[in-house]
Amino acid sequence: MGKIQLLDDLTIQKIAAGEVIERPASIVKELVENSIDANSKNIVIEINNGGKSYIRVTDDGDGIALDDIYLAFESHSTSKLRKVDDLYNLLTLGFRGEALPSIAAVSNIEVLTKTDDTNAGIHAIIEEGKIKSIDKVGTPKGTTFIIKDLFYNLPVRKKFLKSDLTEANKISDMVNKLALGNYYTSFKLVKDNKVVLKTNDSGDIKENVYTILGKDIANGLNPIDYSGKGIEIKGYISSNSLYRSNRSHQYLYINGRYIVNYGLTNVVEQNYRSLIPTNRYPVFILYININPNEIDVNIHPTKQEVKFTGDTDIYGILGIVIKNGLY
């Protein structure tokens, strides 16, 4: 008898979820990105016990239609792609249709949602990756996700989670990144019934930086603003008197998405080499808008890495912009 067997659906879902959902902060990221894509102006994140036992994300966005609820928890079902070419024209944060099925595979979920064109909202309960019940309820326009008992069915993964404080700090860091990148949306983060962050939707980048990163950093930043060759770069970079011992205060966004790109980070840091002490790092909050055809975000499960096509000189342009902003 052969040794190779097909995996059952639940096992497949758990394996896939492991690539997307590493910890509570992963769930917050995926749900908040969905809220942003749904045109939300106000997003509230509530967590208990570092998000291990309870995560609640509430928005005032478009809501989810009843027909879409049935598909939302099926793998690779998405409202953001229709064909493979759409991957190279992405202006949304989500696109693979993996987030909700992955979350449902490792937790229990409640959803409250209402669209603008319906009189009643929907209350859905999802357990073991499947919809158990759907009822009509009164609820405001928008969507609320309640996530409970993360990794209840993956005890080994659950054991590797850190302390409540560490996991809560990971969530704070993730919310900071999302809030800095979406300054036209207000964010509120509540940890164990205590409000720890509240931003507004003014669209003022500097005010947002002040609220999230504090007065000392906000007051030590220089503005930059460039537009040309199909690329826009704006944001703030630190003066030569403001630096940190690590890269924790470096924020880079491409088309609204927080990304990690060591090439671009190195371009920025090279301009500071003679200005700040060795083994110290500049602070920056940079927003780059570029034709989505010139980047590929579909290279990592977290969608936090990008590749550029050979048609763009983003590295050279960024270097000049940073140099001009410093001198």
Label the predicted regions.
Residues M1-Y327:
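N-terminal phosphate-binding caps/lids of nucleotide- and nucleic-acid-binding domains
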